[in-house]
Amino acid sequence: MYLQLQKVRGNKFLATGPTNFQAWSIARFIEQVAAAGKAEYPLPLYINVALRDPLTNPMATHYESGGATDNVIPIWKVAAPSIDLLAPDIYLSGSERILKVIDLYTRADNTLFVPEAGLIADNAKYFYDVLAHGGIGFSPFGIDDNGDSSNDEHLAERLAPFAQEYAMAAPMMREMAQWVFDDKIKAVVEHEDGAEQSIKLGAWDAIIKFGSGRGGELKPNKDHNGKAMIVSLDENKFIMAGTNCRITFRPTGSNAGKAWQYLKVEEGWYENGVFKSLRILNGDETDWGGPAIGDKPRVLQISLVVR
């Protein structure tokens, strides 16, 4: 019956009716359970979503239809109001596909929360993008498992990219929460083609190139795991974090085309709401294509000036 309806031309309801009906039915059942639970113990509730491919609009026979997939989010929001968050489990592959999921589940009525993601090194690069979308959690599956002691080395290798990001973020979690609330965080992740990307920052554009090395051409990232996050503190001052990337800037607006320079670039961390400078990067570390960050995340405070 469903396959026959898919062949109907010119009638969107007939083509999507079974999918929508399935979503409505399951969501209404979940709503009864959730509402009863909240009546006894009013905790916030979320559901894990087994995703469909957000780029290809696959037939319902090719994914777990009935769940809160991107095509039926509005139905779930109406049918299951006791569910506070529709939370995507990210087990898809490909940066374009995953970034699309992050966009689709960031809504005025749905704060982004990633309760599961594959415990693979590549997924660590999406941590910044989740933050930039106002996300309140990013939890790779099994990250809290001690694992098999006979395979500790392999487990440590898989956990390291996530552990390093969380260690970097931990001292400035309160600042990050405020930056997210104020919509000050911008992020990019490296795509499979390794192409450079840019971020608009008001009076400046930030240009991020991915790879390793300082000066000249960067050595491409084998695993395409580069990423960068930039926070606007004021018009000419920024916090940056990232891995396997290099950043430079370009003035825009009335200053477009003018000469500019780094006034100061400091590496450091936040402590009790204050940036603590560990060291000031010298000219050789900033002038040859901009500050570069290797395979371990660092936090930089960057001040710029137009000459």
Task: Annotate each PLM feature.
Residues 215-223, 236-307:
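C-terminal beta-sandwich/jelly-roll accessory domains of carbohydrate-active enzymes
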Residues 1-73:
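Polysaccharide-binding and catalytic clefts of secreted carbohydrate-active enzymes
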